[in-house]
Amino acid sequence: MAAGRAPKVPATAGHRCNAVGMNVLDRFSLDGRVAFVTGAKRGLGRAFAQALGEVGARVAISSRDQAEGESTAEELRALGLEVIAVTGDVTRYADVEEMASRVEGELGPIDVLVNNAGVCEHKPALDVTPAGWSEVISVNLDGLWFCCQVVGRSMVRRRQGVIVNIGSISGMIVNRPQWQPAYNASKAAVHQLSRSLAGEWAPFGLRVNALALGYVSTVMSPEPEGPETHQRWVEDVPMQRMATPDEVAPAVVYLASDASSFATGSVLVLDGGYTVW
């Protein structure tokens, strides 16, 4: 066998969806599976973790702040969900390995990885410093890649697993009125990396997809201030509003579950119609 070439395996390898006797709602269930969500102490990540837990997954959330991560995990446990918090920096490979090892030790092998950790800097291109550029690329791309490789290695060995990478319409369009070249570049790379891994790992029974979100009201993207920002972020959206984390979280459940068993290498756009123009 040529070096680097995936072995031939049955098309059903890693396929956990048994169509016989399974109704549509059953396909969204993650009962018995372990999900790991990065950057989940608040906002989108917290919403993703809650949604995955609500459909039956045992969930691990990561953040760089131990106290905040534990607080979020406690809030989710109070809802009746099985959640643990792990602490680490996704830009440090050793941290990623340690977090993955702890998740597997406490909950079991990771079945679903949701790469949500991300940062953004709003600056014109000529004002971006080398340090500012590196921080955004390091978290949004390097950290995501580290998580994909560390967790993906276990998934490939077990011939099953799902990865959902949180991208953005910023990887498809140029946002206005704010300029954010590093963020835009990082999210475009996330989309293409997702496609690349999907093609390479499909023979091993893995699925890899990306979710390209439009404007969502979070700490990173609060409600717009000023008429120009409001026009670009709200009025230019056919639905005339920003999304909320809880209404985009079900898309992660879809991509993580057997409901999307034939989807891989896709970039699912969820933007209220923003990119139709």
Protein language model annotation of sequence segments:
Residues S168:
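Residue(s) in the substrate-gating loop at a strand-loop-helix junction
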Residues P124-A125, G132-I137, S221, W233:
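Substrate-binding pocket helix/loop in short-chain dehydrogenase/reductase
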Residues R153, G199-P203, S261:
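Alpha-helical segment proximal to the catalytic Tyr-Lys
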